[in-house]
A protein has these predicted regions:
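Pre-Walker A adenine-sensing motif
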Residues: 57-65
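Conserved catalytic network of the ASCE P-loop NTPase/AAA+ motor domain
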Residues: 64-66, 86-87, 99-103, 145-151, ...
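A glycine- and Lys/Arg-enriched "phosphate-lid" helix/loop adjacent to the NTP-binding pocket
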Residues: 120-138, 146-198, 246-252, 256
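Charged, amphipathic alpha-helical linker segments immediately N-terminal to NTP-binding catalytic cores
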Residues: 1-55, 68
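Glycine-rich phosphate-binding P-loop
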Residues: 73-83
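Conserved nucleotide-sensing/catalytic segment adjacent to the nucleotide-binding pocket
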Residues: 37-48, 85-137
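NTP-dependent small-molecule kinase module
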Residues: 198-201, 205-257
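Pre-Walker A (Motif I) flank of P-loop NTPase domains
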Residues: 67-72, 104-105, 212-213
Length: 257
């Protein structure tokens, strides 16, 4: 398994994986309400999610005990982006990312990631176009370096429609208990919807690799989104051939007084 993405049978969920080469798909043509990958009624899908999470929890303990592999889960969506701080801008764009990569035995989740630097930076012109262009190759090399050091990478784009995003933002305003989630920046970024879709399209084309694939997950239905991600994570962990480390000799003879 060292140095490459594990061989995983994702079954029908393979439809959401962006091929590593010659992707002819268009993000704007993909249905954010699609449910063909796991065509179950909601109760069955939620039961499957609960089962997958329980199995992930079990395997996470073995992952930690074995302390050989790490799993990095990258989540990106169509919400407001956090612009880099002046301190972050003073370093190379991967500086803050590398130090947050999970250690062996750990699972790390990036809620937003190094892809901000080819998304928000591109849309808002924070750096020259030639620097954006260079970053795609830099990201691929960085991710390859991680994989060669036993960090398995899963990247999920949570694909919702513009109409669904509007409904969710409005729901936050309408419900006093959800207003704390509202970010005015979401409204400003929403005006750049088409620009972001174009930036994501390029990122998928340039940075979905055999060693660090992108999955475009239909996310209009949160329960379906959760089911897909849980199943992909579970299937990936199962493919890592996780085992507990060998026990010390003579443990069966030890008696605790």
């Amino acid at each position: 398994m060292t140095g490459t993405f594990p061989v995983v049978n994702f079954g029908a969920l393979e439809r959401y994986r962006v091929p590593a080469a010659d992707w002819s798909g268009r993000l704007t043509d993909m249905d954010p309400a699609d449910r063909e990958g796991m065509p179950f009624p909601r109760p069955e899908a939620e039961a499957a999610t609960a089962s997958d999470i329980a199995e992930i929890d079990r395997m996470q303990e073995i992952l930690y005990a074995q302390s050989k592999h790490a799993l990095l889960v990258v989540l990106q969506g169509s919400d407001a982006f956090k612009k880099p701080t002046p301190h972050e801008l003073a370093h190379d764009f991967l500086w803050r990312i590398h130090k947050a990569v999970p250690a062996a035995g750990m699972i790390g989740i990036f809620n937003r990631s190094h892809y901000e630097d080819v998304l928000v930076a591109r849309v808002h012109g924070l750096v020259p176009p030639e620097r954006i262009e260079a970053r795609y190759d830099q990201i691929n090399r960085f991710e390859r370096h991680l994989v060669e050091n036993d960090v398995t990478i899963l990247k999920f784009f949570l694909h919702i429609s513009r109409k669904e995003q509007r409904a969710r933002l409005q729901a936050r305003l309408d419900d006093p208990t959800k207003r704390w989630k509202f970010n005015p920046d979401d409204l400003a970024e929403r005006k750049h919807w088409d620009d972001y879709m174009s930036a994501y399209q390029t990122a998928f084309e340039r940075c979905s690799s055999e060693w660090a694939p992108w999955f475009i997950v239909p996310a209009n239905h949160k329960w379906y989104r959760n089911a897909v991600i849980a199943r992909v994570v579970r299937s990936t962990l199962e493919a890592l051939d996780l085992t507990y480390p060998p026990e010390m000799a003579g443990l069966d003879k030890i008696r605790i007084e």
